[in-house]
Amino acid sequence: MKNNKLGLRIGIVGGGISGVALALELCRYSHIQVQLFEAAPAFGEVGAGVSFGPNAVRAIVGLGLGEAYLQVADRTSEPWEDVWFEWRRGSDASYLGATIAPGVGQSSVHRADFIDALVTHLPEGIAQFGKRATQVEQQGGEVQVLFTDGTEYRCDLLIGADGIKSALRSHVLEGQGLAPQVPRFSGTCAYRGMVDSLHLREAYRAHGIDEHLVDVPQMYLGLDGHILTFPVRNGGIINVVAFISDRSEPKPTWPADAPWVREASQREMLDAFAGWGDAARALLECIPAPTLWALHDLAELPGYVHGRVVLIGDAAHAMLPHQGAGAGQGLEDAYFLARLLGDTQADAGNLAELLEAYDDLRRPRACRVQQTSWETGELYELRDPVVGANEQLLGENLATRFDWLWNHDLDTDLAEARARLGWEHGGGGALRQG
C-alpha cells in the first residue's frame, strides 16, 4: 500500500449539508489536510424541513454521522414508522395508498438543526467564513482558488459544494469547452410554513377532520398542485409545503431581478388552492405568514470534473424536491468521495483516475434522480402522460416508484471504482490521532 507522506490538500467550497459532511469525514484521516470555505459569516441552512430516503440515511451512517443525525431526526411514531407518505385526494382527503420505506419511513429533520449537529464535531481551524469563491486557476497539478476578500488557497483538489448558484460550476464546464449552465425555473412555486402540531390538531377537531392526518406524513394530490406534511422537531412542528404549478408555458422563466424566496400572504396562498378540500384548507389556514419559493433546478451536466476541480451536491445536480432526494444525492456524493480519498492508496498521482471514476459512476445515477424528480412532480399533479388522474394507476405507481432510488447499493459502485483504480481492497486511511 502506497502512503502519500506529503498528504492531500483538499479544499471544499460551500458549507451546506454535503460540504460539511464531507469535511467531517476527510478531516479524520492523517494523510489529508482539508479546509472548508463558506461564503456566509456563519454556518446556516436556508429552508425548513428536509427528508431523507433509506439510501441517504445509509450514506449518513456511512459517513460516521448517524449519531449526530439521530439526535435531531424525526420518524413517524408506531405503528406508522415505516410510512414515507400516505397519498390522498386533494379535494376530500380520500385515501389513495401509501409508500413504505422499511426501517426508515419518513426520516426528516429541520435543516438548521442538522447543520448545527454536524458542525459541533468539526475541528477548530477547518472552516473559514466570509469566503466567496470568485476565480479558479489550475497549473502544474495545483489548484488555486481566489476569494472576493482578496485571499487565496492552493490545494491538490478543490471540491465545489457551493449549491445551485455554484461559482465553481462555470470553471468545470468551461474547462470542458462547454457553456455555463444557469439554474432554470421549473414553473412551480411552493408556499412553505411550519405549523405547531397542537394548533393543527385543534383546527382539525374544529372541522371534524381525522387527527391521523397530523400523526402520519401526508401528500394531498390535485391538478397542478400538491401539498405535503411531515413532522419535525420531535413531532412538535409540522412542516408544510404547498406546491402550485403553471404549465401554460413550455419554458417558463422567472424574472432575473426577482428573489427566489419572498414573503407571501395567507390570502394569496389560499386563493391558489381554492376548491381544495377541508383538510388541505384547514392546514393552510394554520400558516399566517407563508414564504413563497420559486423552484429551480439544473439541466443534466455532461461532466462534474475538470482537472482537479470536482462538483458535488446541488452544484452538480440541483433537482426538484418531489422525491425528497436532493440532499440525499449530495450525501451519496460525499460518501463516495470520502471512501476513495480517505484510502491511503489515494494520492496526487491517481487523483485524475479517481475523479474519472467518480464522474462515471455517480453522474448517471444523479442525472436519473434529477429527471425522475421532475417526472414525479408531473405524477403528483395528475399530469403524467400515462397515469393522468387514474387513481388506481396512481396508487400502484407510487407504491413502488421509489424502490430503485432507495435500494441502490453505493458500495457496489465503490467496489467498481476501486477495481478501475487497481486497488485490490477497500483499505482505509490512517485516522488522525487526538
Swiss-Prot record:
Pathway the protein acts in: Aromatic compound metabolism; naphthalene degradation
EC number in record: 1.14.13.1
A GO MF term: salicylate 1-monooxygenase activity
Alphabetized Pfam families for the sequence: FAD_binding_3
Binding site for FAD: 9-38
Reactions catalysed, as given in the entry: salicylate + NADH + O2 + 2 H(+) = catechol + CO2 + NAD(+) + H2O
Superkingdom of origin organism: Bacteria
Broadest EC class assigned to this enzyme: oxidoreductase
Any one GO BP annotation for this protein: secondary metabolite biosynthetic process
Keywords: Aromatic hydrocarbons catabolism, FAD, Flavoprotein, Monooxygenase, NAD, Oxidoreductase, Plasmid
Required cofactor names: FAD
Gene3D superfamilies hit by this protein: FAD/NAD(P)-binding domain
Quaternary structure note: Monomer.
Name used for this protein in its record: Salicylate hydroxylase
UniProt source species: Pseudomonas putida
